[in-house]
UniProtKB/Swiss-Prot annotation:
SUPFAM superfamilies: FAD-linked reductases, C-terminal domain (SSF54373), FAD/NAD(P)-binding domain (SSF51905), Homeodomain-like (SSF46689). This is Lysine-specific histone demethylase 1. One of its GO terms (molecular function) is chromatin binding. Keywords: Chromatin regulator, FAD, Flavoprotein, Nucleus, Oxidoreductase, Repressor, Transcription, Transcription regulation. Disruption phenotype: Progressive loss of fertility and accumulation of histone H3 'Lys-4' dimethylation (H3K4me2) over generations. Suppression of sel-12 mutant phenotypes, possibly by up-regulating hop-1 expression. It comes from Caenorhabditis elegans. Belongs to the flavin monoamine oxidase family. Its EC number is 1.14.99.66. FAD binds at residues 137-165. PANTHER family: FLAVIN MONOAMINE OXIDASE (PTHR10742), LYSINE-SPECIFIC HISTONE DEMETHYLASE 1A (PTHR10742:SF386). Histone demethylase that specifically demethylates 'Lys-4' of histone H3, a specific tag for epigenetic transcriptional activation, thereby acting as a corepressor. Acts by oxidizing the substrate by FAD to generate the corresponding imine that is subsequently hydrolyzed. Demethylates both mono- and di-methylated 'Lys-4' of histone H3. May be involved in H3 demethylation in mitotic cells including gut and embryonic cells. Participates in the transcriptional repression of the presenilin protein hop-1. May act via the formation of a multiprotein complex that remodel or modify the chromatin. One of its GO terms (biological process) is epigenetic regulation of gene expression. It catalyses: N(6),N(6)-dimethyl-L-lysyl(4)-[histone H3] + 2 A + 2 H2O = L-lysyl(4)-[histone H3] + 2 formaldehyde + 2 AH2. The keyword Nucleus applies.
């Protein structure tokens, strides 16, 4: 595990410095893909921050080389900060000559959570550009989004407090240990598409062991295992249908006559109807072809029979004339009979070839008959419907409620999924401890008042019931979509906003769907599901289409005696007693494993996230009312009376491409931190246009050297103000006309100091003084 000082990583860091990443096209392409960026072109977001790329193609090529090299450098050793000098050392001349551009790229990627995030050792200094009162941030929620936002904001020089209403870190990522010491994950337990997820970097930083899931899965239909050939057959059918839907979803919006979005269930039914219709047409054409070939075969056979009889009759008559000695008496008849025999035999050969062709065709048609139905309505249809049930498990709702245009499933299905031996909650807990975040548990936010000037006021209920008011310059809300839905209907169990949320945001919250995935977690005295070549993940197909997404997927971590299954959508909201749910689960297991399955588990736990007052559901999805702008409207920050954006929103429900995923939650927190920094301390790029901004006074005092695992040292408010050149309240603020001269002197001194140093050190930027 990681230490507070990061000394454990020294050997690996030295090796990374000596060897460096393998910078070739394949490595650069892999690095860009792992960061979810295109390898061969800049994104629109990058073009907005680097407008000089519009000028000529060469600038784009250089930018892509440096950007991808930066990503590769960070991914090679994410235990240590990736600096501009590290990147320059890994790029060949002359592309490493523009250190300012490299610095800007490193700054951009760091700011937006693509490099230098999580738990790593810093080698540069952190700059604080705001006075203490103006750099305070309160993050509501200590889930993946909250931890991500807090760690990023602290790296950017903000003072962060995280408020968590629960008694532990993780939010909807929750786990506990049973009496026998087994980890039971009651919340999010799977990391999806991990190969291009920031979670892979976090796993590497804390040295956690992960296990792939759903790579090869056993399938049981009515208690009998399905052979792998049939499994792949159904998978191919599903992938074809899924691919067709995804293709159509990206062509245009799909709405019905009333203007409502078409559901994925309706789209699948339409597709299956088309397949059934196509199958019937093929069956009709097959029958028609079979009948035509059979008639042709019969016709050729009759022709052969007739020609044979003709030749036989002529031959018999010719023999008779020969026996009677009349061959010379009637030469015309003799020649006529011989001609009939020759003609019949010649024609017979032609007809025989045609008959053989028709007969072979007829046999092939009978050997490979055309199916009358695309899918058997019994077990085959139920098995295929399990694939749709797997989609419901990923979304958390029945496909009847999910928009056809929803394309977030591809970011959950494709790629490698993994579970952790220690549990995902432990990953976030260790990361928070190593970063020494100020997380205050059992602090429930009751009201978010953004009506003030230059601050946001929170009303917080502490563990003992006392109400406390907390003030911050900025707030990052990671309240789940289920809680926000309760807020807009004035449910007393949900926090309130003062003033009320804007109508556009309220409508967006109302339109985004909130799924529900509950778990039935069973602990046994032994692992029976891996016996006889079994696997840690398996499927039991339900014959009932209504329950196709519930209690069908079973998952466990290798070596663990805990087995869990999932209950999805409306089935998850049924208020069945725990013992009934456990009994239903055991019935499914006993059908699949027979006598190998124990009669009952030694312990069990049922989750009910839809009733959890701090969640009210499992995650967001695109409902039939969700518009393309809904997610942007939800994450639109709220402005205080001074016109400044101060309340920002994060959470998986603000990440449209990765809803209902831990990865989406983490990415949304990094995005919110970047938005706050960009809005209030500026982009912070080096001016490479030729007219550089002047650097401020007392630059060295502004730079604070810290380890990322350590707490940023506190500074006196007056001292912090004095550190900022020409600040309004600074005691020795310089006049504007004196600034260029002072800046010039500082630059000369800085250049002299650099010349004396054996190793070049990059200086973090100070905002330009206007």
């Amino acid at each position: 595990m990681s230490s507070d000082t990061g000394s454990e990583y020294l050997d690996e860091e030295i090796r990374g410095d000596e060897l460096g990443p393998s910078i070739d096209d394949n490595a650069l392409a892999a690095a860009a893909s792992a960061a979810r960026l295109p390898f061969d072109r800049p994104t629109d977001h990058e073009l907005a921050f680097f407008p000089e790329l519009w000028e000529h193609k060469t600038a784009v090529e250089v930018f892509l080389l440096l950007r991808n090299s930066t990503l590769a450098t960070w991914q090679y050793n994410p235990l240590k900060e990736c600096t501009a000098l590290d990147v320059r050392n890994n790029v060949f001349p002359p592309f490493n000559s523009d250190l300012d551009l490299i610095q800007n790229i490193v700054h951009y990627l760091s700011r937006h959570g693509l490099i230098n995030f999580g738990r790593y050792v810093r080698s540069t200094k952190i700059s604080r550009f705001l006075v203490r009162d103006r750099r305070s941030v309160i993050v509501i929620g200590a889930g993946a989004a909250g931890i991500s936002a807090a760690t990023q904001l602290e790296s950017f020089g903000f003072d962060v407090i995280v408020l968590e209403a629960r008694n532990c870190i993780g939010g909807r990522i929750h786990s506990f240990k049973s009496k026998s010491g087994e980890i039971m994950e009651t919340g999010g337990d799977t990391l999806r598409k991990i190969e291009d997820s920031p979670m892979a970097t976090l796993l590497h930083q804390v040295n956690f062991e992960e296990h792939g899931v759903f790579d090869f899965t056993s399938v049981f239909v009515e208690g009998r295992p399905l052979n792998e050939e049939k499994i792949h057959l159904f998978l191919d059918h599903y992938k074809s249908a899924h691919g067709a839907l995804n293709y159509q979803a990206h062509q245009c919006e799909h709405r019905d006559d009333q203007g409502s979005f078409i559901s994925r269930q309706q789209a699948y039914e339409n597709l299956l109807s088309m397949c059934e219709r196509g199958t019937l047409i093929k069956y009709y054409n097959f029958c028609k072809s079979l009948e035509t070939v059979a008639r042709a075969r019969e016709h050729h056979f009759n022709q052969m029979k007739q020609l044979r009889m003709t030749a036989l009759m002529a031959e018999n008559q010719l023999k008779k004339m020969e026996e009677e000695g009349n061959l010379e008496q009637d030469p015309v008849l003799r020649r006529s009979l011989k001609r009939d025999i020759a003609t019949s035999l010649e024609k017979f050969e032609e007809v025989a070839d045609a008959f053989e062709t028709a007969d072979n065709h007829w046999q092939r048609l009978n050997e490979h008959p055309q199916a009358k139905q695309y899918m058997h309505p019994g077990s085959e249809f139920a098995t295929f419907n399990f694939m749709l049930g797997f989609e419901e498990y990923l979304v958390g709702a029945q496909l009847e409620k999910v928009q056809f245009s929803c394309d977030s499933m591809q970011n959950k299905e494709n790629g490698v999924a993994a579970r952790l031996t220690e549990g995902i909650a432990e990953l976030l807990t260790q990361l928070s401890e190593k970063r020494k975040l100020d997380i205050r548990l059992k602090h429930r936010v009751l009201d978010i008042d953004y009506s003030g000037f230059e601050h946001v006021l929170l009303k917080v209920q502490r563990e003992n019931g006392d109400i406390e008011e907390m003030k911050a310059a900025f707030v990052v809300s990671t309240l789940p979509i289920g809680v926000l839905k309760k807020t807009i209907i004035a449910d007393e169990r949900a926090p309130t906003f003062t003033p009320s949320l804007p109508d556009k945001k309220v409508e967006a919250i109302r339109n985004i769907g909130c799924g529900s995935v509950n778990k039935c977690i069973l602990e046994f005295d032994r692992v029976f599901w891996t016996a006889n070549g079994g696997r840690n993940q398996f499927v039991t197909v339900s014959p009932n289409i209504k329950t196709r997404g519930s209690m069908n997927i079973w998952s466990s971590v290798p070596g663990s005696k805990v087995l869990c299954t999932y209950i999805v959508g409306e089935e998850a909201m049924l208020e069945l007693p725990d013992d009934v749910i456990i009994q239903n689960a055991m019935i499914n297991l006993q059908k699949a494993f027979g006598n190998n399955c124990p009669r009952a588990p030694i312990s069990a736990h049922i989750t009910r996230w839809h009733d959890d007052e701090l969640a009210f559901g499992s995650g967001a999805f695109m409902s039939l009312r969700t518009e393309t702008t809904s997610f942007d409207d939800v994450m639109e920050p709220l402005k205080t009376s001074d016109g400044m954006s101060r309340v920002y929103f994060a959470g998986e429900h603000t990440c449209s491409s990765y809803t209902s995923t831990i990865q989406g939650a983490w990415m949304s927190g990094a995005r919110a931190a970047a938005d706050i920094s960009n809005d209030h301390i500026g982009i912070g790029f080096v001016d490479i246009s030729g007219t550089r901004g002047q650097r401020g006074d007392e630059e060295e005092e502004l730079l604070i050297e810290v380890d990322i695992d350590g707490k940023i040292p506190e500074k006196d408010e007056n001292e912090a103000v004095a550190d900022i050149p020409n600040a309004p309240n600074a005691p020795n603020a310089q006049k504007p006309e004196e600034i260029p001269k002072i800046a010039e002197e500082i630059e000369l001194v800085a250049e002299a100091e650099k010349a004396e140093k054996a190793e070049v050190q990059l200086e973090p930027l100070v905002p330009t003084v206007e």
